[in-house]
């Protein structure tokens, strides 16, 4: 029997062979991607060669996600399960599935020892994740589908390489004193490190049980005012009361467009979400983002088939 025949096809094949009936067409491999970024990468690379199911919808929080009965049903018949790793989704540590489970981020960035699991915000890491997803898919796809997978992988990696160049130009357009990213919690350290941006995660280390004390507010206000920041960036369209307090204390506005740090934005993909985030940051810090270039990157990504 073909070693790469998906689990979902084995029973049907046995029945048909037992009956001596017509030849059977193997079912597609079943792939489950836990979060939205990996889901988009897996869907793009797999094209029509595999059935890809996404567990966390756009806008969902991977940190607090809990498996639903329908998720467990998909996992029970999966050939491959993909999650970022690094503790991004704690529930992913206890997956019950007969398929192979791959912590894509941990494989792609094996030397990372920090505390920020959002590794894909660095396009170089995202390109490495594409390669890991491709290798994982190759292990469950029939041999006949692998040449096309390799072609799609090469195109996808090229897009993320171009994304890195594009992002570098956007941040380089800002004066060095304005390359500052003020957010609530550490989410963009990988992006900040790649492009020499100062990330200030205001609430990390300054809150107790989620409560911002007056002394902490004073410290945050001083740090933000001295940073060169022009804007505070929120993770949702409705900023929290805490962020509004900080905005009032610092005199800095909260960006009208939120940053999407936990996955992909609704109606967008991994690449267009990345360009949206970068344009939001650059424009908020007084720069002007290259939207035409962003649109071109997105067009290249969605054309991968």
Where are these regions (language model features)?
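Bacterial N-terminal signal peptides that target proteins for export
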Residues: 1-11
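Bacterial N-terminal signal peptides
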Residues: 9-20
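Extracytoplasmic metal-acquisition and chelation regions
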Residues: 26-305
């Amino acid at each position: 029997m073909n070693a790469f025949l998906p689990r979902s096809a084995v029973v049907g094949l046995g029945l048909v062979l037992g009956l001596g009936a017509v030849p059977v067409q193997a079912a597609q491999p079943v792939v489950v991607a836990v979060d939205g970024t990996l889901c988009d990468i897996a869907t793009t690379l797999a094209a029509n060669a595999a059935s890809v199911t996404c567990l966390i919808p756009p806008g969902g929080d991977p940190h607090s996600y809990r498996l639903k009965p329908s998720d467990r049903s998909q996992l029970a018949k999966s050939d491959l399960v993909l999650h970022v790793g690094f503790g991004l989704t704690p529930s992913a540590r206890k997956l019950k599935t007969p398929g192979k489970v791959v912590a894509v981020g941990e494989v792609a960035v094996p030397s990372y020892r920090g505390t920020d699991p959002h590794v894909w915000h660095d396009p170089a890491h995202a390109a490495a994740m594409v390669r890991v997803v491709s290798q994982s898919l190759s292990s469950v796809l029939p041999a006949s589908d692998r040449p096309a997978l390799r072609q799609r992988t090469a195109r996808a990696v090229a897009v993320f390489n171009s994304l890195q160049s594009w992002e570098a130009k956007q941040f380089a357009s800002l004066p060095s004193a304005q390359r500052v990213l003020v957010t609530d919690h550490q989410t963009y350290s990988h992006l900040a490190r790649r492009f020499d941006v100062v990330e200030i995660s205001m609430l990390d280390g300054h809150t107790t049980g989620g409560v911002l004390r007056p002394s902490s507010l004073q410290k945050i206000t001083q740090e933000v005012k001295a940073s060169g920041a022009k804007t505070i960036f929120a993770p949702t369209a409705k900023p929290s009361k805490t962020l509004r307090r900080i905005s009032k204390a610092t005199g800095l506005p909260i960006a009208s467009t939120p940053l999407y740090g936990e996955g992909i934005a609704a109606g967008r993909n991994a690449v267009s979400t990345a360009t949206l985030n970068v344009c939001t940051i650059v424009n908020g810090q007084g720069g002007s983002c290259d939207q035409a270039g962003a649109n071109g990157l997105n067009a290249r990504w969605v054309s991968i088939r």
